[in-house]
């Protein structure tokens, strides 16, 4: 059982919902990434999604695009992100880490080399935004062979056939994009999310995390009522964009702790 699977099994046993924060590796300061990861874990994150910056992040809105640009300008690469995970693992052997990004940096490194290096660094999962599930079978097999969970996106527009395709190859969890468009956009409609989750649950044998549009404890709690986990990214990237450097880690921890408390309340009402 992978670290991600163990985490979700423990959450289910406790009647709690997962909290999955996203930050871009290297933003705003590459030297702070590992400190930020520890702050997320200390605040109550169950899984950490670490964005691998890319020059053409087509699924991301302006906030995360700017974040990627800043990280790339500071020399952040896939190799340096893996080094950050390895440093994080030196003092946190428990919190799962998922790399989220695009195919190009992985393919430049080589899928086999990436799988080996990611496993050695302590990566638990990988979500490649631009790998459609119908073309990702071999990639998913190679990740699982390296004890890395391949994680896939589903959207409001996903057909039952697409959901079933994902169900055949996903492990760890699936990430349901609750809004059409790019990250950080729009307003949440929890009833529409609740309407889609049963179709996913009936075809996908792993937990469902919901993200895009979650901005505060209130929206996190509402989404947690109808999902297994809540993913929050753009709001955290904005927080880091505006925080004073010396207080950024503490601000992250405080914000995540507020979400954690809200989700634990949702978990209790769901039991």
UniProtKB/Swiss-Prot annotation:
Domain of life per record: Bacteria
Query: Which pathway is this protein assigned to?
Result: Amino-acid biosynthesis; L-tryptophan biosynthesis; L-tryptophan from chorismate: step 5/5
User: Cell membrane as a keyword?
Assistant: no
Q: Which residues are the active-site ones? A: 49, 60
Q: Which cysteines are joined by disulfide bonds?
A: none
Where does the secretion signal sit in this chain? none
Catalytic activity of the protein: (1S,2R)-1-C-(indol-3-yl)glycerol 3-phosphate + L-serine = D-glyceraldehyde 3-phosphate + L-tryptophan + H2O
Is Ubl conjugation included in the keywords of this UniProt record?
no
Q: Which GO terms describe its molecular function?
A: tryptophan synthase activity
Pfam families the UniProt entry points to: Trp_syntA
Q: Which CDD domains match?
A: Tryptophan_synthase_alpha
What PROSITE patterns does the entry give? TRP_SYNTHASE_ALPHA
What keywords does the record list, in alphabetical order? Amino-acid biosynthesis, Aromatic amino acid biosynthesis, Lyase, Tryptophan biosynthesis
| Quaternary structure annotation from Swiss-Prot or TrEMBL | Tetramer of two alpha and two beta chains.
Q: What is the protein named?
A: Tryptophan synthase alpha chain
Q: Which organism is it from?
A: Burkholderia cenocepacia (strain ATCC BAA-245 / DSM 16553 / LMG 16656 / NCTC 13227 / J2315 / CF5610)
Organism lineage: Bacteria, Pseudomonadati, Pseudomonadota, Betaproteobacteria, Burkholderiales
Q: Which gene encodes it?
A: trpA
């Amino acid at each position: 059982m992978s670290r991600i699977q163990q985490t979700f099994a423990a959450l289910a046993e406790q009647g709690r919902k997962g909290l999955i924060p996203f930050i871009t590796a290297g933003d705003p300061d590459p030297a702070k990434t590992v400190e930020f990861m520890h702050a997320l874990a200390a605040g109550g994150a169950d899984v950490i999604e670490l964005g691998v910056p890319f020059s053409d992040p087509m699924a991301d809105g302006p906030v995360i695009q700017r974040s990627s640009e800043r990280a790339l300008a500071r020399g952040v690469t896939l190799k340096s992100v893996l080094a950050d995970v390895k440093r994080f693992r030196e003092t946190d052997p428990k919190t799962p880490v998922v790399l989220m990004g695009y195919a190009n940096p992985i393919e430049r490194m080589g899928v086999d080399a990436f799988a080996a290096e990611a496993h050695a660094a302590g990566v638990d999962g990988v979500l490649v935004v631009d790998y459609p599930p119908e073309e990702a079978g071999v990639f998913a097999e190679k990740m699982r062979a390296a004890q890395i969970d391949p994680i896939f996106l589903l959207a409001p527009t996903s057909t039952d056939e697409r959901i079933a395709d994902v169900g055949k190859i996903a492990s760890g969890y699936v990430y349901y994009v609750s809004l059409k468009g790019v990250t950080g956009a729009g307003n949440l409609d929890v009833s529409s999310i609740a309407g889609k989750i049963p179709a996913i649950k009936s075809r996908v044998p792993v937990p469902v995390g919901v993200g895009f549009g979650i901005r505060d404890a209130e929206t996190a709690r509402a989404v947690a009522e109808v999902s297994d986990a809540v993913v929050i990214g753009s709001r955290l990237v904005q927080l880091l964009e505006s925080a004073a450097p010396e207080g950024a880690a503490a601000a992250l921890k405080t914000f995540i702790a507020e979400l954690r408390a809200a989700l634990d309340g949702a978990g209790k009402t769901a039991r």
